[in-house]
């Protein structure tokens, strides 16, 4: 069995025993298998829309003799579960738009869901903002560097909190941790935004204003 990546190790660290989990987009099932081995009283539904990927997951689960802890299902998002089957959702490796689309399409399935753990590297402001709208707050966040890529992992819990634009953009918990990896991530974002602004064509006024706002936030927060 392949070793769990650093990225998925951080995702796994946010999961507790006695949880009823759906691992959406489980791919080869490595995260589900890791959790099933780690905890005694955990129930996992490993799902994927890709038949071949799920087939590999099924084989991996059988090799580890974990069929009693992990059930596999082929299908899209939350379509393949009932609300009483889950209290925790894990989604790792998808874009923010796709993730929010999955959750918004089946809001009735979230009634018993207390925890949602997400790893996404696209438009984290959009992700955080829409998770707040869905009735979840940011309980914890972590950064992890794996193969020279800095990944963001966020644990959302059911409840209400308000956040400023700055906190939704940078991440309120990441700001409070203020570690070297966060500064490195911000330095990279400053360089990326500066490059985009230098190359962007005339017009696109709203997009430019958004980029400039984000750049000001990054520069005012850190000396890079």
Question: What are these language model-derived features?
Answer:
Residues 43-48:
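Conserved SAM-binding motif I beta-strand of class I
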Residues 18-27:
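Conserved class I S-adenosyl-L-methionine
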Residues 55-84:
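S-adenosyl-L-methionine
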Residues 85-93:
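Short SAM/SAH-binding signature in class I
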Residues 29, 33:
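Glycine-rich SAM-binding Motif I of class I
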Residues 50-52:
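Conserved SAM/SAH-binding beta-strand->alpha-helix loop
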């Amino acid at each position: 069995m392949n070793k769990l990546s650093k990225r998925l190790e951080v995702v796994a660290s946010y999961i507790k025993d006695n949880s009823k989990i759906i691992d959406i987009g489980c791919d080869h099932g490595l995260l589900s298998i890791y959790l099933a081995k780690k905890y005694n009283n955990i129930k996992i539904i490993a799902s994927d829309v890709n038949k071949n990927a799920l087939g590999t997951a099924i084989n991996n689960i059988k090799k580890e003799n974990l069929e009693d802890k992990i059930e596999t299902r082929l299908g899209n998002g939350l379509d393949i579960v009932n609300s009483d089957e889950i209290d925790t959702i894990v989604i790792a490796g998808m874009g923010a738009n796709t993730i929010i689309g999955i959750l918004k399409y089946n809001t009735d399935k979230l009634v018993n869901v207390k925890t949602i753990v997400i790893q996404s590297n696209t438009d984290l402001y959009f992700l955080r903002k829409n998770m707040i709208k869905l009735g979840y707050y940011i309980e914890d966040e972590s950064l992890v560097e794996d193969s020279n890529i800095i990944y963001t992992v966020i644990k959302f819990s059911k409840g209400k909190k308000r956040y400023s634009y700055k906190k939704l953009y940078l991440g309120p918990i990441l700001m409070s941790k203020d570690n070297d990896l966060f500064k490195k991530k911000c330095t990279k974002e400053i360089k990326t935004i500066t490059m985009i602004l230098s190359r962007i064509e005339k017009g696109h006024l709203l997009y430019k204003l958004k980029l400039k706002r984000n750049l000001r936030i990054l520069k005012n927060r850190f000396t890079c």
